[in-house]
Amino acid sequence: MTIGVIGRKCGMTRIFTEEGVSIPVTVIEIEPNRVTQFKTEETDGYRAVQVTVGERRASRVTAAQAGHFAKANVAAGRGVWEFRLEEGDFQAGDLIKAELFTAGQLVDVTGQSKGKGFAGTIKRWNFRGQDNTHGNSVSHRVPGSIGQCQTPGRVFKGKKMSGHMGAERVTVQSLEVVRVDAERNLLLIKGAVPGATGGDVVVRPAVKARG
């Protein structure tokens, strides 16, 4: 089973091993994920489980969303996520909690990175700067040439240039689960995970550790 859970990033701290070694960890709160729909090959063409988490005011829920949540007999959440299933069955209303993971397990964590606004090529793509002297004037942080000549006569798609940096979907792979606190619904994951404090993250079993 390769499903994951939706959590909320609470911030970073550190814990100590019995030998006194300090381990930096990110604390992720795993509110019980409520199953809103179980998709099958017969009805949807593929197997998946759809979940929601958290709460949303009734005034912020559309009629279609309200009907979808009411059909599953679950409270409206702040979003809907879906995980593909290889095996196993779920029913609408089931809860998926932090106990899905165990200490020592490797996981992939997906979140939205912090937005940095408009950034130049040096900050955004780690370009080197131009010469500080030797005749250079007002061109110390410019990217340089962005193309060729009349042929091809255009700038190729994907060219690394200035633009909006951050605020994009990022996945960090193969992070270790240091501790699972089932009573407080917390996961302590070694290292940093994408996004700002309070942001939603998706925690899945590591794809590179499946065999």
Swiss-Prot record:
Function, as annotated: One of the primary rRNA binding proteins, it binds directly near the 3'-end of the 23S rRNA, where it nucleates assembly of the 50S subunit.
Residue numbers carrying N5-methylglutamine: 150
Organism: Pseudomonas putida (strain ATCC 47054 / DSM 6125 / CFBP 8728 / NCIMB 11950 / KT2440)
InterPro entries tied to this protein: Ribosomal_uL3, Ribosomal_uL3_bac/org-type, Ribosomal_uL3_CS, Transl_B-barrel_sf
Database matches in PROSITE patterns: RIBOSOMAL_L3 (PS00474)
Name used for this protein in its record: Large ribosomal subunit protein uL3
NCBIfam families named among the record's database cross-references: L3_bact
Protein family membership: Belongs to the universal ribosomal protein uL3 family.
Keyword Ribonucleoprotein: yes
Signal peptide: none
UniProt record, GO biological process: translation
Gene Ontology molecular function terms on file: rRNA binding; structural constituent of ribosome
Modification after translation, per record: Methylated by PrmB.
Gene: rplC
Subunit note: Part of the 50S ribosomal subunit. Forms a cluster with proteins L14 and L19.
Keyword RNA-binding: yes
UniProt keyword list: Methylation, Ribonucleoprotein, Ribosomal protein, RNA-binding, rRNA-binding
GO cellular component, one term: cytosolic large ribosomal subunit
